[in-house]
Amino acid sequence: MVGALAYAWSDTFWFSAVEGEVYAYSSFCTALVFWLILKWESVADLPHANRYIILIAYIIGVSIAVHLLNLLCIPAIVLVYYYRKYKNTDLKGSLIALLVSFVLIVLLLYGLVPGFVEVASWVELLFVNVFHLPFNSGVVFYFFLIVGVIAWAIYETYAQRSDKLIKISFLISIVLVGIPFIGDGYIIGIVLTAALAYYLFTRKKLAVVAMNTILLSLFVIFIGYSSYALIVIRSTANTPMDQNSPEDIFSLGGYLNREQYGDRPLFYGQTFPAEIARDANGTAISTKGKAIWKKKLKTSEDEADRYIAVSYTHLRAHETL
């Protein structure tokens, strides 16, 4: 009742409700997620109380496709969880809980959200350019692979046939959804994957219930996140407004990463009056980012499908500071 009345006299909420934007739906998801964690808090000691945690994960997965604002609920959710599950709470524990919540936000915002598309694009490139299969064959394979692997991992946590199988299936699931692949490239992903593997295989006692909850949460986040398929379906219809035309996994990645808006250095880098840095011959010194892949136009019907690198991200000249 207090929360409803707070919204009733909130100018921000009503202003968002009357404009044709995503903020009203996003506010609804935010309120729903926090209400669900309070419901969990009231039944946390009962069997199957984790179903509220899994439902929260699903709502977060859906809300990611609406607006990333919902991720800001994670610190509050973690604090409620900490104060409910631990009896001897103190300032140090609260700060650690906040730190854990920030790590979760980073893993979702910079790991899962772009990492899923990143791994899917690698598989698509492998299937089309190396195996010479049709367009989107890699994406379809990756979709069924990730569903099958997560389902297998969930089954292993229920059956508990072997600790080794639980560890392997859990590790493969985390890697396939792209969580370790933070940022461009794969170096950070390899390091984080190795660290997770070391942690799993050096622990003698597994937190099977926690691993099961994590896997179920990842699965429902994946289901909610799949609403992004609407973007590809809509773009394939070639509607009048089709920004970036995200008709394949590569253009979808650029669309989700908002690459069309560009970027600017916030803490360190060039300023707006900075001059272009040049070498001794007067040629501008430039930096190439990762390749931007596009479908190659066929010259004949017998030609196999193929992606080609048409340009590079962050292709710009270095500027003096």
Where in this protein do the model-derived segments appear?
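Membrane-interface segments at or immediately adjacent to transmembrane helices
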Residues: F222-K295, T299
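Membrane-interfacial interhelical loops
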Residues: L109-F141, K167-G185, I233-Y255
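Membrane-interfacial entry segments at the cytosolic side of transmembrane helices
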Residues: K87-L99, L133-V139, A159-S169, G185-I187, ...
